[in-house]
């Protein structure tokens, strides 16, 4: 109900809210068996993510791709907590905010990620969602956030070098 009220809409059109089923961890985990792709997007805490993976892993089908939308935690470290059978179907998928308007998505493979799974995910992101995809290494903050930090530091340096206030 809240999504339909947001301006601008986080969805392509407001009627798309009808495609979303509200669910919770206590009663609806079995619904995950019907999903082709599960994207985890909770707070950037390794312990919370690991706990969530332990809860959802038993409910995923043998073909479900699972991805973390982390913006900087190690994808390999996250993968290490998953059952071995799931690891080839796990990767990082970093959308930028707001995802409806931001074109770029980073795919971050793990040591165990299946190349065919990553290729299929990239095809889906480009053809169905219209995203531009960059493959990133499992390095701190991946590609775009590293560039962003360097850019912010450069602005701060030049602002100080020219004697400007940061509000000018």
Predicted regions and their residues:
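Beta1-alpha1 glycine-rich phosphate/pyrophosphate-binding loop at the start
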Residues: 1
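Generic secondary-structure signature for well-ordered alpha-helical cores
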Residues: 4, 8, 61, 123-131, ...
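Rossmann-like NAD(P)-binding element
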Residues: 4-66, 72-77, 84, 104-105
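A short alpha-helix-loop-beta-strand transition element characteristic
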Residues: 12-15, 116-117, 165-166
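Rossmann-fold dinucleotide-binding core
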Residues: 65-146
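Helical "substrate-binding/catalytic lid" subdomain
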Residues: 126, 139-168
């Amino acid at each position: 109900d809240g999504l339909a009220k947001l301006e601008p809409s986080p969805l392509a059109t407001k009627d798309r809210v009808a495609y979303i089923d509200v669910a919770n961890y206590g009663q609806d985990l079995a619904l995950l068996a019907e999903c082709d792709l599960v994207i985890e997007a909770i707070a950037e805490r390794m312990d919370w993510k690991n706990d969530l993976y332990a809860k959802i892993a038993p409910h995923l089908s043998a073909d479900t791709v699972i991805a973390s939308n982390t913006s900087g935690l190690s994808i390999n470290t996250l993968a290490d907590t998953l059952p071995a059978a799931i690891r080839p179907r796990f990767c990082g998928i970093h959308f930028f905010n707001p995802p409806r308007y931001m074109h770029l998505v980073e795919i971050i493979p793990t040591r165990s990620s299946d190349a065919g799974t990553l290729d299929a995910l990239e095809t889906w992101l480009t053809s169905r969602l219209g995203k531009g995809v960059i493959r990133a290494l499992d390095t701190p903050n991946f590609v775009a956030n590293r560039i962003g930090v360097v850019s912010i530091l450069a602005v701060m340096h030049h602002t100080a070098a020219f004697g400007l206030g940061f509000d000018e």
